[in-house]
Regions:
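Alpha-helical membrane insertion/targeting regions
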Residues: 1-137
């Protein structure tokens, strides 16, 4: 199997997840709870597909070495470290935030979502930036 297209596919999934989260946020700000729920559950589904595809790619291909040097290399690894830590952190946060909403505990849902939302957006954006730096520079 040719795995060469998976990094681009993963970046598209990552960007799509971030866009869905932003659309979900916009709809909850407009008090459109049912549309918010659909966007957020869609974002979770896209993120799950991303994660499976990401694992398959790295299982089959291994790690890819960043080719840049100097300040761009420092920037890349700083971004990668923050992205990786927050990507691991966001998974239980998203699951907890969704669980609270699905159980109807909206006070706690809103409280944790204030942290979950910006981290999820950061991870989506930095994931795409890392892809561009690693595969397109």
């Amino acid at each position: 199997m040719d795995y060469s297209l998976l990094p681009t596919f993963n970046a598209i999934l990552n960007a799509s997840s971030g866009i869905l989260v932003l659309l979900g946020y916009r709809n909850i700000k407009r008090s459109n709870e049912s549309v918010h729920k659909r966007f957020m559950l869609s974002a979770m589904g896209v993120s799950a597909i991303f994660f499976a595809s990401y694992l398959i790619y790295h299982w089959e291909v291994g790690s890819v070495k960043f080719q840049g040097s100097g300040l761009i290399r420092t920037f890349y690894f700083t971004l990668l470290i923050s992205h990786t830590i927050l990507a691991v952190t966001i998974v239980p946060m998203v699951l907890r935030t969704a669980y609270l909403a699905l159980k109807g505990n909206f006070a706690k849902h809103r409280k944790i979502a204030k942290f979950t939302f910006p981290i999820w957006i950061y991870v989506s954006i930095t994931g795409v930036i890392i892809y561009l730096m690693l595969y397109q520079l």
